Amino acid sequence: MVSILAIRTFNPLGHFVSTQCVRAYAINSVRAGSKSSSVRAGSKNDTTRASSKKNKAGKSKLQLSARFKQNANKSQKADKFKSQKQFKYGLYGGLKENENKFLETNANLVEKITEFEELKLLPEVRKHVINLIKKDSLNTTEEIHPSPIQTIAIKRLSKNLMEPKLQVHAIAAETGSGKTMAYCAPLLDYLKRQEIETPEKWESIKDKAIIRSVILVPTLELVDQIYTTLTCIPDTLGIHVHKWTTGVDYQQLLENLKSRTDILITTPSKLLSLQRVRMISRADLILKRIEFVVLDEADTLLDKSWLEDTHKALKAMSDVNHLVLCSATIPNEFDRTMTKMFPNAIPLTTPRLHKLPKGINFRIINAAVSPYKGSKIKALAQTLYAIAYDGTDPGFEKRCIVFINEKKNVDNVVQKLRNEYGHDVVGLTGDMEGRTRLELIRPFISPPEKLTEQEKQIDKDLNDQETVNISGSNISIGNIENSNKASNFIPKLRVLVTTDLLARGLNFKGVRNVILYDVPITAIDLVHRAGRTARMRQSGRVFMIIDKKTQSWAKAVPTILKKNKALT
């Protein structure tokens, strides 16, 4: 007997998420007193048949039992394999396991497609995208190839790019993997194809005060970075890119709108503020004509503190054809929110999601041992000296980012590093005015500066001196006490002390060193902080300062990296 049970999963927004059929198989046992009850008792043949049936039934049960055991063993092996590939880091706020039915297909796609010429992009768009990537890269001599997430995203989005219906895609890939261009390339292609494939529509809108697409991000710094990325080379496509943030006055905004805005980069709250600008009549109609929307750092934009503004902004843009969610992490809470809001979203992920970048050299510094004796600030200062004198990046100034868990401690650390240890250091928190923040981070997001000839010689002399090991770690520095060369000189090292405000999405060009002054308490924080270095196949170092209170899951990070495990 076979019974079929149909199960429907229903979510609070009224969407049917999935329909499954679960088949339950029931094995009927043969009852005494059935058809065989008319057979004579004591018959030898009947006894033989009964014995045969009994043996067959016994074998059947044994075979069924064996199958169940095999399935159980397979399940146990799968769970064991999964546990070998995943590592539970942190106290709470875990990350979703990287599992979806497209992973294997995506991996094959990346292996098959290695050139931008193999992706469906208009020739002029392809050329422009390659030039944008080249301009944004530190190594301008190497040949430009699409990164795995760029291959996956461009390939999938181009499939039905111009269909006039809502399509939702969720891009998720490791930090520093080229996600910005993974969504910008299809966006640029979409805008140019509208001009070519629908000339009548294009003629009717090309001189109108409209916004054709929007990229929403959570911070001022990200608005500025994406705007710079898209405008860093001369415009060869005729695409008007504008930003709407605290650094743009209303008059400039109005001028931008009059000349047609093809791509507007802003935050959800600033986008909604268009409805309150008196000089803009019917802002609601402008928002309704937006057809392509990107939520970059979507896990932030859809968390509790941002969700209301983000939801209002999406609701105002009611005629969207493409919605792209982009993030370097998929926290469990974000995954639940995304499933409720966008049950039909197509995941576009890479196998390395939630893994630390391959190019990271992760080092532990124990502040509990001598000579620090429990002083984390001493361990931090000594580590900065080690970075300054280690002989890496010869001829260029070095940069280092120090991450702290709470903004109230930023100023204290900055003052001690500057006044007691003589480091060139600045601090940055969300309490600062927007323009001040942009000025402070500019040296860290720009390519590294070359040293002067005098600085190069001092740098070389210092790097030639003897080295001594730092206690409680696997790093060494120049033996400053025994050196007579430039004893009061610290090689050019810029240090930025900040919180998670700058751990999201920012491309710190040439930053090879990150120090985790406080141990990140969640896997999300660790992935984003460590991901400020070793971006786009570059190398980098992360130093984590620990003490007696540090949990074993934090101390295990170097092993996690070595074993290529994903964080959960």
UniProtKB/Swiss-Prot annotation:
One Pfam annotation reads DEAD
What InterPro entries does the record point to?
DEAD/DEAH_box_helicase_dom (IPR011545), Helicase_ATP-bd (IPR014001), Helicase_C-like (IPR001650), P-loop_NTPase (IPR027417)
The UniProt entry, under PROSITE patterns, shows: HELICASE_ATP_BIND_1 (PS51192), HELICASE_CTER (PS51194)
Question: What SMART domains does the database record attribute to this sequence?
Answer: DEXDc, HELICc
**Location (main, coarse):** mitochondrion
Do you know which Gene3D superfamilies this protein is assigned to?
Answer: P-loop containing nucleotide triphosphate hydrolases
Residues forming the Helicase ATP-binding domain are 160-348
This protein's domain notes: The Q motif is unique to and characteristic of the DEAD box family of RNA helicases and controls ATP binding and hydrolysis.
Protein name listed in UniProt: ATP-dependent RNA helicase MRH4, mitochondrial
